[in-house]
Regions:
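Active-site and channel-lining beta-strand-loop segments
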Residues: 1-3, 70-76, 80
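Structural signature of FAD isoalloxazine-binding scaffolds in flavoprotein oxidoreductases
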Residues: 87-92
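Adenylate-forming
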Residues: 45-51, 72-74, 93-95
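Glycine/small-residue-rich loop that forms an oxyanion/phosphate-binding "nest" at active or ligand-binding sites
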Residues: 37-43
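A charged helix-plus-loop insertion that forms the helical arch/lid used to bind
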Residues: 7-18
Length: 251
């Protein structure tokens, strides 16, 4: 999360950063001849998809990326919306659980969807569950050669596709939580196109399918009947393209 256009990072849970003057550090490293611009990574990725990818030519789009964490970029009337304090699109911190029993999130709060469906938390849960003394007998473990630490979300997705009970149950828990966050955003923003991407979703097609099905049930029909749901197209190039174009527009 950025505090200001100078690039002060308020909180980057997956990097362990709080109140880091990244813009100043970057400017010092680049020198005075190279202007430094700092953008939220998912905003840059979303803008890259708007300029040259899955949201190209669409004036109202929501791009959601589920990787190590979860974030979104909001495009409205052809413009990137970053909000009054640059926090627009922080969909990973939409609450899907409450109370002391809710999962802790790196942002310092509890119950955020990222604390359940973010890739780092999913990987940790898989390892913890399958390494437990009374671990479920899951095909996902066999797919990874029997090593709980080697089991990836891709293995779990494949196991679920093959009918594995534990994998189906776990995905059946995560998909509705992601759908709550997506459905709330779709109801609030009414995008024409929803772009889905990120390292986790791109490798777990069944989880993506289940989340989309749950989303269509969770959001109002008036908001979804014309909604196009597509996969991100640009991969790792999206952020570079988006940041370059945003920097060009900032000068």
């Amino acid at each position: 999360m950025l505090r200001d256009r100078r690039g002060t990072v308020v909180n980057a849970p997956n990097l362990g950063w709080r109140d880091v003057a990244f813009g100043e550090l970057l400017a010092a490293a680049l020198g005075p001849r190279r202007p430094a611009h700092v953008f939220n990574d998912v905003n840059a990725i979303a803008w890259g998809e708007r300029v040259a990818g899955a949201a190209r030519g669409v004036d109202d789009a929501l791009a959601v990326f589920v990787g190590t964490g979860i974030g979104a970029g909001v495009i409205a009337r052809g413009q990137l919306i970053d909000g009054s304090s640059h926090c627009a699109g922080e969909i990973g911190h939409v609450k899907v659980a409450w109370g002391d029993g809710a999962a802790p999130c790196g942002c310092g709060q509890r119950g955020c969807v990222e604390a359940y469906v973010g890739g780092a938390h999913v990987a940790a849960h898989i390892t913890r569950t399958l390494a437990a003394p009374r671990a479920p007998r899951s095909l996902a473990l066999a797919l990874a050669g029997g090593d709980p630490a080697a089991v990836t979300p891709s293995h779990v997705d494949q196991a679920a596709q093959d009918g594995d009970a534990w994998a189906l149950e776990y995905w059946g828990t995560l998909a509705p939580l992601l759908a709550i966050a997506l459905g709330n955003a779709v109801a609030m923003l009414n995008p024409r196109r929803l772009v889905l991407g990120g390292g986790l979703l791109s490798r777990t097609p069944l989880l993506r399918e289940q989340a989309v099905m749950a989303l269509m049930l969770a959001a109002p029909t008036a908001c979804t009947e014309a909604l196009e749901i597509v996969d991100a197209e640009l991969g790792d190039d999206a952020g570079l393209l988006g940041a370059a174009d945003l920097a060009r527009r900032s000068e």
